[in-house]
Amino acid sequence: GPKTISIKSMADLAGKTVAATRGALEDQELTKVAPAGTEIKRFEDNNATVSAFVAGQTQLLATGVSVAGVMMQKNPQLNTEYKLLLKDSPNFIGVAKGEDALRTKVNAIIADGKKSGDIDKMAQKWLGRPAGQLPE
C-alpha cells in the first residue's frame, strides 16, 4: 500500500479496503486474519486486482511479492511499500525422481547464490526486497 498509510499489524487493516484475487492464496490467508471492519474487495484475476488498486478503488493490495514488485516498478507515482507478510510461501524447483545429479547441481547453484549474496541481489533487483530466509 501507499507509504502514507501506516500498517504495522493485522489489526491496522480494520477500516481499510483491500484488493485480493478471488480464491488466491492471498484471499484465503487475508480472510483468515483480517479483523472485523476490513473490507476485502475480490477480483477475478491478478490483472483486475492490481488495476483496481492502481485506479484507487482500494487502499491496499494483497498479492504475491512478484506481482507487487512489478506493480511498484510500473507505478512509482503510487509511492507504495510492502506492509505485512500474510504467509511465507517460497517457490520450489521440481526435479524428476532419479535425477540425483541434476538435483545435486541445482542445490549447489542455490547454495552458492545464497552464500555469495547473488540471490538477495536478484530478489532486490526484481522484487524490490531481499529474498529472506530460504529453505535448506
Regions found by a protein language model. Give the residues of each.
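A ligand-binding cleft/hinge motif common to bilobed small-molecule-binding domains
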Residues: E29-V33, V54, Q59-K87
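Flexible hinge/capping segments at coil-to-helix
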Residues: G1-T17
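Periplasmic-binding protein-like
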Residues: G69-A111, R129-E136
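Beta->alpha turn/N-cap motifs
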Residues: G1-P2, G23-L25, D45-N46, A62-G69, ...
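Ligand-binding clefts/hinges and TM-proximal coupling segments of bilobed small-molecule sensing domains
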Residues: L25-I40, T80, I110-E136
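Small-molecule pocket liners
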Residues: K16, T38, S89-I93
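Hydrophobic residues within well-ordered alpha-helices
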Residues: L13, A52-V54, V106
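Short helix-initiation/N-cap motifs at beta->coil->alpha
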Residues: I5-S6, K41-A55, K87-S89
